[in-house]
Amino acid sequence: MVSQRRDADAPKSILESLAGTRVLVVEARYYDDIADELLAGARAAIEAVGAEARIFTVPGALEIPSAIAILMEAGRKAGGPYDAAVALGCVIRGETGHYDIVAGESARALMDLSVSEHLPLGNGILTVETMEQALARARVSEMNKGGGAAEAALSLLAIKRAANLEPAR
């Protein structure tokens, strides 16, 4: 997680300051077994700090940035905005150039969205060469990249709050 200087008015724990936050999780379930592991890791990391995960599913990695943008706006308009977002999916290299487009454009769109909207966003879209690499990175018992993506989003949210850009709930 994030470390911060301990001022007198700083929260006792960054983790305590994240309790009750709403985290949007958008997952691509193109590979169900990988998606299950990524989601389990992300959900565990979010719940560990007392935050709430709201999960939506899209067909593939390229749809994730658009879905996050749509759902963030819908949350704002409904009066229940999300505090952070997590993108989960997997792109495995094939025989064509499709991998390069999906991997590059999904990452670019997520970064553009995060920077332009000041959105704490964790990118858990795996870009790998083989199914074995994907499983090793997705499994909670191994590299737990879903949990890592959620922790990244929560760390960015803590930074945003420490900078007084967003009040704690």
Swiss-Prot record:
Pfam annotation, one family: DMRL_synthase
Database matches in CDD domains: Lumazine_synthase-I
Gene Ontology terms describing biological process: riboflavin biosynthetic process
A GO term for molecular function: 6,7-dimethyl-8-ribityllumazine synthase activity
Chain sites annotated for binding (2S)-2-hydroxy-3-oxobutyl phosphate: 95-96, 137
InterPro entries xref list: LS, LS/RS, LS/RS_sf
EC number, as in UniProt: 2.5.1.78
Catalysed reaction equations from the record: (2S)-2-hydroxy-3-oxobutyl phosphate + 5-amino-6-(D-ribitylamino)uracil = 6,7-dimethyl-8-(1-D-ribityl)lumazine + phosphate + 2 H2O + H(+)
Annotated residues for binding of 5-amino-6-(D-ribitylamino)uracil: 30, 61-63, 90-92, 123
One GO CC term, this protein: cytosol
Top-level lineage group: Bacteria
Keywords of the record: Riboflavin biosynthesis, Transferase
Pathways involved: Cofactor biosynthesis; riboflavin biosynthesis; riboflavin from 2-hydroxy-3-oxobutyl phosphate and 5-amino-6-(D-ribitylamino)uracil: step 1/2
Active site: 98
NCBIfam families per record: lumazine-synth (TIGR00114)
Biological function: Catalyzes the formation of 6,7-dimethyl-8-ribityllumazine by condensation of 5-amino-6-(D-ribitylamino)uracil with 3,4-dihydroxy-2-butanone 4-phosphate. This is the penultimate step in the biosynthesis of riboflavin.
PANTHER family from the UniProt entry: 6,7-DIMETHYL-8-RIBITYLLUMAZINE SYNTHASE (PTHR21058:SF0), 6,7-DIMETHYL-8-RIBITYLLUMAZINE SYNTHASE DMRL SYNTHASE LUMAZINE SYNTHASE (PTHR21058)
Family as reported in the entry's similarity comment: Belongs to the DMRL synthase family.
Protein's name in the database: 6,7-dimethyl-8-ribityllumazine synthase
Annotated organism of origin: Methylorubrum populi (strain ATCC BAA-705 / NCIMB 13946 / BJ001)
Lineage of the species this protein comes from: Bacteria, Pseudomonadati, Pseudomonadota, Alphaproteobacteria, Hyphomicrobiales
